[in-house]
Swiss-Prot record:
It is an enzyme of class 6 (ligase). Pfam families: Mur_ligase, Mur_ligase_C, Mur_ligase_M. The gene is murC. It comes from Aliivibrio salmonicida (strain LFI1238). PANTHER family: UDP-N-ACETYLMURAMATE--L-ALANINE LIGASE (PTHR43445:SF3), UDP-N-ACETYLMURAMATE--L-ALANINE LIGASE-RELATED (PTHR43445). Belongs to the MurCDEF family. This is UDP-N-acetylmuramate--L-alanine ligase.
Amino acid sequence: MTTEQKLQLAEIRTMIPEMRRVECIHFVGIGGAGMSGIAEVLLNEGYHISGSDVAENSVTVRLAEKGADIFFGHHASNVEKASVVVVSTAIDQANPEIVAAKENRIPVIRRAEMLAELMRYRHGIAVAGTHGKTTTTALTTQIYSEAGLDPTFVNGGLVKNAGTNARLGSSRFLIAEADESDASFLHLQPMVSIVTNIEADHMDTYGGDFEVLKQTFIDFLHNLPFYGQAVMCIDDDVVRELLPRVSRQVITYGFSDDADVRLINYRQEGQKSFFTVQRKDRTDLDIVLNIPGKHNALNATAAIAVATEEDVEDSAILSALLNFEGAGRRFDQLGEFETGNGHAMLVDDYGHHPTEVDVTIKAARAGWEDKRLVMIFQPHRYSRTRDLYDDFANVLDNVDVLIMLDVYSAGEKPIAGADGRALCRTIRARGKLDPIFVPTIDALPSVLANIIQNNDLVLTQGAGDVGKLAKQLASLELNIQAMKELG
């Protein structure tokens, strides 16, 4: 950090009141992406941070190195020094740390409440939507950083250029991913809100009623001040439908002819995307984006729309997108397999909704037309598999080889007929593809070793622990013999 940035940070800190009577902030489930990001920013602001999780990971190691007290396992004693306890909705209310905190009258708050506190005295930019939040947050962060604006950011995944998912910046800007999964994004009061798209997901939160979900997004946008800005993707049918109900200033973006910020002339070559962005009363931008897919071009256009409103220099926008390294587990190219007679490419992707899987397949096809596409898919949550069963079957039918794992439950109880084996039967019955069901992830390396061919593109897909498998394979330098031995 430069001397000038240190002075700017000092000035910002004088404007932001410290949280009174708060000395130690404890995070239950601190190893998660969303929780760890907030914890890291608060740690850098000078608060004493502690946290617990079930196991060590790279995030807990980094936080411990920065001075946080990390506990493994959940025990009442972990919150003895806490002034406030931060939890996510994934944490059971019977957790002994939550119980102990309530018994001792220690405030227990949701992670979004703490994020809202960070945003309260800053120029907040909140990125919401069913898909694309993490990448759009990373893209916006990259542009603002390239422009020298040094934003604070809190993302749901790794911002590769920064090497972290959160950082305390020296400016007034805070860029954050806004989570609709538990409706907690309603706590946020940003200056700018992006909505990338709206689809039926996390419907248990909304009582299974899509109208409730749509109204919640409207309520989120109405948390903007009257002088705030909503940036909305007009290509999305639901977003377009909601536009007349938004009583805030709106900028639309997309491929559509009537978009305020319009994307045209898209093409993809390998991992790079090329397109032009047209802006009202501004010079057109010829973009080279260093990640593939039309969906990512849309994500970048959202970031461009926000940056343009802030009068960020075009040169910074162009440079940031050209040099953008991506977001963690978003079409993450991890290396190559040695197949014995050549090589196969390994890509890891977090997408776990049919729409996300579909755009990932399309990006792979567009950039690597000559490769056979081998997908290892791990369904995420029984409820999502049940609710979107036919959509999953339709999308997964579009790869060349499908290896299906069982559902990553994320704490849910099994639902009959909503598992990996059932999906395999449904897809097989259609006659186009013969999926291979692998009941345990430990058995996958040896299965994979017998399937991979020269020039394949192997895609690990899902939000569960399939990503850990991808890293494990990459750490073995993706050697076929090593995979056979691992299996």
